[in-house]
Each structure stands twice: as structure tokens, then as C-alpha cells.
């Protein structure tokens, strides 16, 4: 499990990138502020995860789903997050589906190419 409380923090690079994206370019953030934001984000993530785990357990689920997270956010009075998260979730699912289809398509075309190459090689080897 977790040995130190610092192990629960989100990566500093991720936090730094999020801060940079959220603020104007002219804004600067001290190291202490970055550390505080990182800790707050980690605590929030743990809180939502813990609450979602309890919700899933109540519903006899072993796995937390996106639906559990969204419902938990609503119950915790963070319902203003739900519309944008739902939209982001739809985009994520679409990207995953497209990648999966692309991978399957690539695999099918490779299989077809291998079959064609094999048939060509067999035809070339056949005695006349």
C-alpha cells in the first residue's frame, strides 16, 4: 500500500501542465502554491475515489465505473463538473473506439496482405 503520504500526490509535471493551461501566460505560480495545488488535487481525487468505491459497494459492484464517479460528484455537490466530464468521457470513448477499429483494420489488412503474398508465392512455386 502507501508508505508515505507524499506517495499519494499526483505527478508534479502533470500538475504544472494543468496550472499552465488554466492560467494566462503572464501568470506565475510559486513552488509552495504548486505544492498546495498538487496536494489539494490529490486529496480531491482520493475523496471522490473513496466515495465512489462506497457507492459501488452499496450497489454490489466490485468495479468503480464512470457512472459511479459522475453520480458521486453530484452527491458531493460537484454537479457543475458533470456536464463537462460527461462530454470529455464521450470524446475519450470515441477516441478509444477509433483506435480499436484502426488497429483491427490494420490487422485485417495485414492478414489479407499475408494471404495474398502466400498465394502469390505458392503460385510461383507451382510447376508448370
Swiss-Prot record:
UniProt keyword Nucleus present: yes
Molecular function GO labels: chromatin DNA binding; protein heterodimerization activity
InterPro entries the UniProt entry points to: CBFA_NFYB_domain, DNA_Pol-Epsilon_Subunit, Histone-fold
CDD domains in UniProt: HFD_POLE3_DPB4
Gene Ontology terms: cellular component: ATAC complex; CHRAC; epsilon DNA polymerase complex
Alphabetized SUPFAM superfamilies for the sequence: Histone-fold
Biased composition (Basic and acidic residues): 98-110
Subcellular compartments: Nucleus
Main subcellular location: nucleus
Record key words, sorted: Nucleus
GO biological process: cellular response to gamma radiation; CENP-A containing chromatin assembly; chromatin remodeling; DNA damage response; DNA-templated DNA replication; heterochromatin formation; leading strand elongation
Bias kind Low complexity: ranges: 111-128
Ranges for region Disordered: 98-128
Entry function: Accessory component of the DNA polymerase epsilon complex. Participates in DNA repair and in chromosomal DNA replication. Histone-like protein which promotes nucleosome sliding of ATP-dependent nucleosome remodeling complexes. Part of the chromatin-accessibility complex (CHRAC) which uses energy/ATP to increase the general accessibility of DNA in chromatin. As a heterodimer with Chrac-16, binds DNA and facilitates nucleosome sliding by Acf. Has a role in DNA damage response by preventing cid mislocalization to chromatin.
Subunit relationships: Homodimer. Component of the DNA polymerase epsilon complex consisting of four subunits: the catalytic subunit PolE1/DNApol-epsilon255 and the accessory subunits PolE2/DNApol-epsilon58, Chrac-14/DNApolE3 and PolE4. Component of the chromatin accessibility complex (CHRAC), composed of Chrac-14, Chrac-16, Acf and Iswi. Forms an heterodimer with Chrac-16. The Chrac-14/Chrac-16 heterodimer interacts with Acf (via N-terminus). Interacts directly with Iswi and this interaction is further stabilized by association with Chrac-16.
Protein name: DNA polymerase epsilon subunit 3
Gene name of the record: Chrac-14
Amino acid at each position: 500500500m502507501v508508505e508515505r503520504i507524499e506517495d499519494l500526490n499526483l505527478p508534479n509535471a502533470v500538475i504544472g501542465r494543468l496550472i499552465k493551461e488554466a492560467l494566462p501566460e503572464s501568470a506565475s505560480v510559486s513552488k509552495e502554491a504548486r505544492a498546495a495545488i498538487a496536494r489539494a488535487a490529490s486529496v480531491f481525487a482520493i475523496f471522490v475515489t473513496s466515495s465512489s468505491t462506497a457507492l459501488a459497494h452499496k450497489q454490489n459492484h466490485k468495479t468503480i465505473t464512470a457512472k459511479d464517479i459522475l453520480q458521486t460528484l453530484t452527491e458531493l455537490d460537484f454537479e457543475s463538473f458533470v456536464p463537462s466530464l460527461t462530454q470529455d468521457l464521450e470524446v475519450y470513448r470515441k477516441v478509444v473506439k477509433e483506435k480499436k477499429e484502426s488497429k483491427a483494420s490494420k490487422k485485417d489488412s495485414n492478414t489479407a496482405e499475408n494471404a495474398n503474398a502466400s498465394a502469390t508465392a505458392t503460385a510461383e512455386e507451382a510447376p508448370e
